[in-house]
Design a protein with these regions (language model features):
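Beta/alpha (TIM)-barrel catalytic core signal, keyed to glycine-rich beta->alpha loops juxtaposed to Asp/Glu
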Residues: 1-153
């Protein structure tokens, strides 16, 4: 951290942050964010891995720390569970035309989330992922409806 701070003071680094991809590291991320000032954190958060919403996302929101969400599809676990199952009949009301959009829009609509970074090597998936950002994001009531539907599958 001292080296990073020196690089920032020198103007060679503008923003600093920390990252992890597992829920069992959230407590350590919280500890570090409580002790050091960072501009952003990158963390896993999804319908399959919602643990960050309990403490880490509120902490970031309170401290003005930008949140980048990695692993939004939980390494494909969300798609595996949704395979063969229809989107809810009201999916278009929350701007979703695919399961990928459903998952991304649920994440992006959390008030602490700044951006979601899904990884893909398939152009069609990239197009679908980008479409998730076209409509207004779900509100708190819609997010809860999305979560409840997901839990019912």
């Amino acid at each position: 951290v001292p080296t990073l701070r020196a690089l920032q003071a020198d103007g060679r680094v503008r923003y600093s942050g920390i990252t992890h991809y597992r829920a069992d590291a959230h407590a350590e991320l919280e500890r570090v964010l409580g002790a050091e000032k960072f501009d952003w954190v990158q963390v896993n958060y999804s319908l399959a891995e919602p643990e960050a919403a309990a403490r880490l996302l509120p902490l970031c929101q309170d401290k003005g720390i930008a949140v980048m969400v990695n692993r939004p599809f939980a390494d494909g676990a969300l798609f595996a569970r949704a395979r063969g199952k229809p989107l809810p009949p009201w999916a278009t009301e929350v701007g979703c035309a695919s399961w990928g959009q459903f998952f991304l829009r649920w994440i992006a609509s959390h008030p602490a989330v700044t951006c979601v970074i899904p990884a893909t090597s398939k152009p069609q998936h990239m197009i679908d992922n980008a479409a998730a950002g076209r409509a207004p994001l779900p509100d708190a009531k819609q997010r809860e409806r999305m979560r409840a539907y997901w839990e019912s599958l």
